[in-house]
């Protein structure tokens, strides 16, 4: 594993001995990455082109130091064009173990819509290892599919959208909530989805392309296909929101899904 260039080591050492100090007076919770490091004298631009150039890739995420966490965040922002104004630096002044223990909701609270993106990337590293980045184009395509299906913008998440989650009716910004609400709204469903076992939370996609078209219309994404949508649905297996069912087009709500049970609506 190649070592970091001298300029990066100097910069990271500076970060370690200043911004990571628990009593750093200028570490405003609302301060963004660009606020902290806009001066090139203290924040020379990273030249990462691939993950293997980054030192954080030599360590399992649970063993990352605060410096590794910072480096990983910077890589994600550079590689996937995340708006750094969405991310509060102080919210990620933590170790890798603390980072890995964060839930998706905590990522969203810490970084808005960027938080969903970061959570998705971290979970892929934890399950696939750094091989997730071996094919840069493939990893970008995977993340792009997730972004397309969850109203994220791969061309750059705008800061005004950082906390724009809506969880009402069929306007929910989470795909699984949209599916849930569609199941609970016969007047909107039009035979697109149907329950197979209401009590167990098992349902079937009857009209796959119609579902993709409706979701695309809700998110103003005319490129949405069921292939992309189903990839995003399968991602929910990792979070416990959906559970795998060994039948085509059939899904089941998991332990972390809410609002679908008749007695808990």
UniProtKB/Swiss-Prot annotation:
GO biological process: cell differentiation; ectodermal cell fate commitment; mammary gland epithelial cell differentiation; negative regulation of cell differentiation involved in embryonic placenta development; regulation of transcription by RNA polymerase II; somatic stem cell population maintenance; trophoblast giant cell differentiation
GN (gene name): ELF5
Domain note: The PNT domain acts as a transcriptional activator.
DNA-binding region extent: 173-254
Tissues expressing the protein: Expressed exclusively in tissues with a high content of epithelial cells. Highly expressed in salivary gland, mammary gland, kidney and prostate. Weakly expressed in placenta and lung. Isoform 1 and isoform 2 are differentially expressed in different tissues. In the kidney, only isoform 1 was expressed, while prostate expressed both isoforms, with levels of isoform 2 being higher. Expression is up-regulated during keratinocyte differentiation. Several epithelial carcinoma cell lines showed lack of expression.
Protein name, as recorded: ETS-related transcription factor Elf-5
InterPro entries in UniProt: Ets_dom, ETS_fam, Pointed_dom, SAM/pointed_sf, WH-like_DNA-bd_sf, WH_DNA-bd_sf
PNT domain boundaries: 43-129
Family under the similarity heading: Belongs to the ETS family.
Record keywords: Activator, DNA-binding, Nucleus, Transcription, Transcription regulation
A GO term, aspect molecular function: DNA-binding transcription activator activity, RNA polymerase II-specific
Taxonomic source organism: Homo sapiens (Human)
GO-annotated cellular components: chromatin; cytoplasm; nucleus
Function summary: Transcriptionally activator that may play a role in regulating the later stages of keratinocytes terminal differentiation.
Subcellular location: Nucleus
Disulphide connectivity of cysteines: none
């Amino acid at each position: 594993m190649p070592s970091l260039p001298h300029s990066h080591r100097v910069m990271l050492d500076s970060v370690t001995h200043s911004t990571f100090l628990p009593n750093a007076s200028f570490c405003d919770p609302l301060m963004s990455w660009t606020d902290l490091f806009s001066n090139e004298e203290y924040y020379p631009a990273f030249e990462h082109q691939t993950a293997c150039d980054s030192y954080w890739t030599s360590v399992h995420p649970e063993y990352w130091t605060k410096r590794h966490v910072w480096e990983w965040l910077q890589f994600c922002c550079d590689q996937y064009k995340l708006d750094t104004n969405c991310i509060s630096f102080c919210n990620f002044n933590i170790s890798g173990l603390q980072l890995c223990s964060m839930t998706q909701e905590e990522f969203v609270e810490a970084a808005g819509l960027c938080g969903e993106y970061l959570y998705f990337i971290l979970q892929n590293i934890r399950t696939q290892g750094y091989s997730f980045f071996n094919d840069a184009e493939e990893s970008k395509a995977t993340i792009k599919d997730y972004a397309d299906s969850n109203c994220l913008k791969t061309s750059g998440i705008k800061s005004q959208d950082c906390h724009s989650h809506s969880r009402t009716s069929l306007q929910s910004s989470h795909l699984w909530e949209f599916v849930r609400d569609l199941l609970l709204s016969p007047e909107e469903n039009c035979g697109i989805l149907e329950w197979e076992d209401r009590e167990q939370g098992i349902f079937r996609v009857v009209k796959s392309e119609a579902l993709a078209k409706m979701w695309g219309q809700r998110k103003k994404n005319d490129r949405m296909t069921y292939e992309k949508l189903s990839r995003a649905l399968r991602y929910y297996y990792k979070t416990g929101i959906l559970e795998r069912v060994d039948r085509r087009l059939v899904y089941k709500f998991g332990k972390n899904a809410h609002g679908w049970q008749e007695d808990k609506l």
